[in-house]
Amino acid sequence: MSETAKKVIVGMSGGVDSSVSAWLLQQQGYQVEGLFMKNWEEDDGEEYCTAAADLADAQAVCDKLGIELHTVNFAAEYWDNVFELFLAEYKAGRTPNPDILCNKEIKFKAFLEFAAEDLGADYIATGHYVRRADVDGKSRLLRGLDSNKDQSYFLYTLSHEQIAQSLFPVGELEKPQVRKIAEDLGLVTAKKKDSTGICFIGERKFREFLGRYLPAQPGKIITVDGDEIGEHQGLMYHTLGQRKGLGIGGTKEGTEEPWYVVDKDVENNILVVAQGHEHPRLMSVGLIAQQLHWVDREPFTGTMRCTVKTRYRQTDIPCTVKALDDDRIEVIFDEPVAAVTPGQSAVFYNGEVCLGGGIIEQRLPLPV
């Protein structure tokens, strides 16, 4: 069977990137079908970009391209493997990244297995802005060509085996090119805005949404000097480095500089703040990470020089990584970094290649 006659199942989200991915694969001669995943049972009404509207858009695109669209419900898997962990992390005072977990457990596990076993797929494809390259018999994950849209940060948990079974057609393009293709084809998704909500849950108001599942516990806001200057509505609504939504202005003694969250005392339900986005209490010289995933699946020992991102869209930070044991590493930055947040992911790179990453267990504060 020739490479180009192979069957690809495209994860159709109802967005422009997956729509154009399906068309690009058709142009490359693959046998293309779509799959729409429903991963959340609750419908919050028409004001949100609901699964029903997304499904209608996905169906319209598939009709236009002349391909079959399958649907599958992964709501149970999403609840058990993504959402419960997401809530547990917030409860513990950390700030998780559900999109990374969703890619790991749903898009590149449940979807990959379903496509291969139930639909006879040779490959799956998604609209992620990443690229793959085969080096020394292993598939590597590369940054997307469009540096503004690169999504490798969200896919660091993938193994080389999963990458080998996945295609990323728009990773070779820039976003404006993708929209232009969709417009030229007359696809309904051409001008649809990019989704920014929690993976699969949509554009709900975050505080309201989280409050349904975790009871909020108001508590004190104190400065780094120990002065009480306000009340927070729940630690879970705040993350390190956050400026908005604190409800405090300048103080009589302080400057007019804005306040930032510099620490969360979970045990005592206290939010600690300081003025200025470069306050020493916000800065870290490094971090400890755990729950490590390396794309090549080789255990990491010793030390290495590379770059790291501690959040999406951050400029790469040069660093030295040292193995502490099988599942923990110490990362020392070349220069102090602001707002390193436990629960988020640290993702490592060697040039264009995403090496893997782990969950930030603790930050190493700047000695004061």
Curated annotation (Swiss-Prot):
Belongs to the MnmA/TRMU family. It comes from Escherichia coli (strain K12). This is tRNA-specific 2-thiouridylase MnmA. It is an enzyme of class 2 (transferase). GO terms for biological process: tRNA wobble position uridine thiolation. Keywords: ATP-binding, Cytoplasm, Disulfide bond, Nucleotide-binding, RNA-binding, Transferase, tRNA processing, tRNA-binding. During the reaction, ATP is used to activate the C2 atom of U34 by adenylation. After this, the persulfide sulfur on the catalytic cysteine is transferred to the C2 atom of U34. The reaction probably involves hydrogen sulfide that is generated from the persulfide intermediate and that acts as a nucleophile towards the activated C2 atom on U34. Subsequently, Cys-102 acts as a nucleophile towards Cys-199, and a transient disulfide bond is formed. The record marks 128, 344 as: Interaction with tRNA. Residues 97-99 are annotated as: Interaction with target base in tRNA. It comes from the Bacteria. Changing residue 199 to A: Abolishes the incorporation of sulfur from the sulfur-relay system; loss of activity.
